[in-house]
Amino acid sequence: MVSSLSRNGNSHHNGVNVAITSGFSTKLAPLPNGPLFGTDGIRGKAGDLLTAPFALELGFWAGQVLKANKVTPGPVIIGQDSRNSSDMLAMAMAAGLTSAGLEVWNLGLCPTPCVAHLTRISQAMGGIMISASHNPPEDNGIKFFNHEGTKLSQTLAQQIEDGLRGHLSFDRDRNREWGKTYHQANLVDTYCQFLQETLPENLDLQGMRVVLDLAWGASVEVAPKLFKALGAEVICLHDRPDGNRINVNCGSTHLDLLQQAIKEHQADLGFAFDGDADRVMAVDSQGRVVDGDYILYLWGKHLLEQGKLPHNLLIGTVMANLGFERAWEALGGQLMRTAVGDRHVQAQMWETGAILGGEQSGHIICHHHSFSGDGVQTALHLAALVRQSGESLATLVNESFQTYPQILRNIRVEDRDRRRYWQECTPVMEAVNQAEAAMGNTGRILVRPSGTEPLIRVMVESCSADDANYWVNYLVNVVEQHLAN
């Protein structure tokens, strides 16, 4: 156990150290200089920052902060995806939380929105999900929820980080209130029942053939169970927990195998989830990708026609396609854009009273039912919408909108400061301004650092595919030359 931390950090390791492992060493090394919490909690390679001793210490300080700010008296609920490091991190977090005197409910393997939902309905003090979402197997992450099942505020996240860095004091020797851990995998059934209750009464998917790509991840049990319960014929890909293969060439960011399976099985539609099932991408019977923009349009139109969409308002992000925006406006709707990240979408939904929002990448939030993105719920509701329409998903997509050609490229930039302050690089800004001036109102450009990976993302969108391709290549070359090297 790392020793007590003082306000000035004068412990034997200065209060700013975490364990790194070589084999099973607990040799201490400094925390990184930048913020620990990104847009979706703490992420990194398992065994580097994310070790058992670090998670133990993080759990302890999270427990102290949650206790000090508690609104409800209940437990802290922990879930995890299938990564090989998830057991280790979940158990270490539980040990840290119980050392702070808190009760822990461990759900085991489950989707992230399952943790969020159960946290909200159980009077829990907070929730924790061990997952790196769509990232590769060697990565992992720790994300926090407040008692309402929404993401922990930046203020509380900073307090937890202050504890880790030795800027808060606590005499551990006087702490004699130990918590307990309870294994509550059965509560995942409560979440499944909730999802069914959000669907139209007497919904019957008999005769619908659905392919599910479960990405070797957190949705392997929940998604097939629910679709089968509704009568659908279900064909599953990557359908068992596999910590070595989670997200590898499968799931919501790799749709080739799903598209192939839909054609081979002559399926009506298919869905691909990411590793923790908080996002989903759909594919129609023709093999076309139905991304978050299409899902928002179709679900939004359905709610608009029922009079259940306040102000005809959808919340999207800066990545939302112009074709989607202009088609939605033609229906009398309005699209409000936020920065990328479901945290920003959620905040804008609360501020405006919107009940439907999401991202092109497949994070969809519907306040009629939930307060967090839920891939399985979104897939079920899209299937329900298709069944109620009497049309195929392919027909609904044909009748919706044409996307503008949009090209997204990722450039690996290891230097964190170069990613954060890319706008201070004069050659890059000059190139962006040049491209924007050339395209005028026929397209747009977005350059931004990833919030979860060491990448700078360059997106160019234009009514002309040739223009989009030309300018994205031009900008990528400039970014690689001045930021990546």
Swiss-Prot record:
InterPro entries: A-D-PHexomutase_a/b/a-I (IPR005844), A-D-PHexomutase_a/b/a-I/II/III (IPR016055), A-D-PHexomutase_a/b/a-II (IPR005845), A-D-PHexomutase_a/b/a-III (IPR005846), A-D-PHexomutase_C (IPR005843), A-D-PHexomutase_C_sf (IPR036900), A-D-PHexomutase_CS (IPR016066), Alpha-D-phosphohexomutase_SF (IPR005841). Activated by phosphorylation. GO terms for cellular component: cytosol. One of its GO terms (biological process) is peptidoglycan biosynthetic process. Mg(2+) binds at residues 133, 274, 276, 278. The active site is at residue 133. Its cofactor is Mg(2+). It comes from the Bacteria. The keyword Phosphoprotein applies. Keywords: Isomerase, Magnesium, Metal-binding, Phosphoprotein. Its EC number is 5.4.2.10. One of its GO terms (molecular function) is phosphoglucosamine mutase activity. Binds 1 Mg(2+) ion per subunit. It catalyses: alpha-D-glucosamine 1-phosphate = D-glucosamine 6-phosphate. Catalyzes the conversion of glucosamine-6-phosphate to glucosamine-1-phosphate. HAMAP family: GlmM_B. Belongs to the phosphohexose mutase family. This is Phosphoglucosamine mutase. It comes from Rippkaea orientalis (strain PCC 8801 / RF-1) (Cyanothece sp. (strain PCC 8801)). The gene is glmM.
